[in-house]
């Protein structure tokens, strides 16, 4: 990165950025929600677009001088529509959580009932967790995974839905390695008169590449982040397969009287001015670049390799005696239950960090440990695949992780971690991140 000016003006911050660049280039990133953007994405995010206020939407701004940021936002919207095959998209949400908030605010009233996957079973904070707005403003009910299979039991989902009759059902996860039967979720939603929202923040890139099922034909709303498997800048997005009249009865005045607002109009108003003001135009520019990259044939090859790497790694972990929640993976991640190894997620995360491997501790279903300790770790392949690593590398990485975890109680574990760190550094230097230099 060209940071000469920053180095001269703010040496303290420059040093932090240089060290972080070194960490990213010389250690292995296996956090499932992280990835490396292209230099083009970073250039767009660091461009003069950051200087422009642009409240409103293209052609309907509250500020003047928006003709060029309008181009950027329209590019992002048009490319997202082509990428996912949707009629409506809003690229302004600052995050996936903001996107989820906008959807919930647009169709729910405080106290309404919602259903989502339990956080401790792989869900997300915004799907009804009691520590989040989604569990504080609304009456949240959680479905979970089966204790034996580790998979979602759709019969139990239907049973819960019929019992509580939610107004919104959310399908999506942050630590679930299987797919969602979105068609079955829609049947259940229709039975109880609920909206259906899919949160595809994690597998969005794999869906865009056509390798996992697209939920848009079956859901009222689809939300996502724009980073993770999409390899864009950190941000959020809301989509609808097709627009429809809002069923809440919200109207708008016309010259001849009034009409029902289309759901797109309700959603746009909920994003801005509902929960946000000025959009981050430099990030939206970066989203446009990333969506353009994802439309190229090479992105499908990348996404396919992400899945292959995860499958190879999961197979090796199973061979080494690890329990993978749900029995395997069909996407980019896996959740390792470490209870049989007598190691906590916290200990594993810290040891692997010292060995140059970054993962995150993660609760497993029916965990008896706190979220600050946990019984598992979450492992993902998006970032390592961006570096060009393949199945053979995935097997090696699983072996190195096993070497660290099985040595947790040994007196020479620190020496072993230093040795593994050197192997990891060599692996990373053989597979550099394109364009990243300290």
From Swiss-Prot:
SUPFAM superfamilies found in the cross-reference section: PLP-dependent transferases
EC numbers: 2.1.2.1
Protein residues bound to (6S)-5,6,7,8-tetrahydrofolate: 119, 123-125, 370-372
UniProt KW keywords: Amino-acid biosynthesis, Cytoplasm, One-carbon metabolism, Pyridoxal phosphate, Transferase
UniProt main location, coarse: cytoplasm
Pathway: One-carbon metabolism; tetrahydrofolate interconversion; Amino-acid biosynthesis; glycine biosynthesis; glycine from L-serine: step 1/1
Catalytic activity: (6R)-5,10-methylene-5,6,7,8-tetrahydrofolate + glycine + H2O = (6S)-5,6,7,8-tetrahydrofolate + L-serine
Subcellular location: Cytoplasm
Keyword Transferase: yes
Residues carrying the site annotation Plays an important role in substrate specificity: 227
A Pfam short name: SHMT
Modified-residue entries (N6-(pyridoxal phosphate)lysine), positions: 228
GO molecular function, one term: pyridoxal phosphate binding
PANTHER family assigned to the protein according to its UniProt record, in alphabetical order: SERINE HYDROXYMETHYLTRANSFERASE, SERINE HYDROXYMETHYLTRANSFERASE 1
Record note on quaternary structure: Homodimer.
Entry's family note: Belongs to the SHMT family.
Name of the protein in its database record: Serine hydroxymethyltransferase
Species the sequence originates in: Pelodictyon phaeoclathratiforme (strain DSM 5477 / BU-1)
């Amino acid at each position: 990165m060209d940071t000469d000016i920053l180095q001269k003006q703010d040496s303290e911050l420059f040093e932090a950025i240089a060290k972080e660049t070194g960490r990213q280039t010389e250690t292995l990133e296996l956090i499932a929600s992280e990835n490396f953007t292209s230099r083009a994405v970073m250039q767009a995010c660091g461009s003069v677009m950051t200087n422009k206020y642009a409240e409103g939407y293209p052609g309907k701004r509250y500020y003047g001088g928006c003709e060029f940021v309008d181009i950027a936002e329209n590019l992002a919207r048009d490319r997202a529509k082509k990428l996912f095959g949707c009629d409506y998209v809003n690229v302004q949400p600052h995050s996936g959580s903001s996107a989820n908030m906008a959807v919930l605010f647009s169709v729910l009233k405080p106290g309404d009932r919602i259903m989502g996957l339990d956080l401790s079973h792989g869900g997300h904070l915004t799907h009804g967790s009691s520590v989040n707005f989604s569990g504080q403003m609304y009456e949240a009910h959680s479905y979970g995974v089966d204790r034996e299979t580790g998979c979602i039991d759709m019969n139990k989902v239907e049973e819960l839905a019929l019992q509580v009759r939610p107004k919104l059902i959310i399908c999506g996860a942050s630590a679930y390695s299987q797919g969602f039967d979105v068609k079955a979720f829609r049947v259940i939603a229709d039975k109880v008169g609920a909206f259906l929202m899919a949160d595809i923040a994690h597998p969005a890139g794999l869906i865009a590449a056509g390798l996992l099922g697209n939920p848009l034909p079956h859901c009222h709303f689809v939300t996502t982040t724009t980073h993770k498997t999409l390899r864009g800048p950190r941000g959020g997005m809301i989509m609808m397969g097709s627009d429809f009249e809002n069923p809440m009865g919200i109207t708008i005045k016309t010259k001849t009287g009034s009409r029902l607002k289309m759901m797109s109009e309700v959603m746009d108003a909920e994003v801005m001015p509902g929960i946000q003001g000025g959009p981050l135009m430099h990030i939206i520019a970066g989203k446009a670049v990333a969506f353009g990259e994802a439309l190229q044939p090479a992105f499908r090859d990348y996404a396919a390799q992400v899945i292959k790497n995860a499958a190879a790694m999961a197979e090796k972990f199973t061979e080494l005696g690890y329990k993978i929640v749900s029995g395997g993976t069909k996407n980019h991640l896996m959740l390792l239950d470490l209870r049989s190894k007598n190691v906590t997620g916290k200990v594993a995360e810290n040891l692997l960090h010292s060995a140059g491997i970054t993962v995150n501790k993660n609760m497993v279903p029916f965990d008896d440990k706190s979220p600050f300790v946990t019984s598992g770790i979450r492992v993902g392949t998006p970032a390592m695949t961006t570096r060009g690593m393949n199945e053979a590398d995935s097997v090696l990485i699983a072996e190195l992780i096993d070497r660290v975890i099985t040595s947790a109680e040994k007196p020479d574990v620190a020496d072993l971690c230093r040795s593994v760190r050197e192997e990891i550094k060599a692996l990373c230097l053989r597979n550099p991140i394109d364009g990243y230099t300290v």
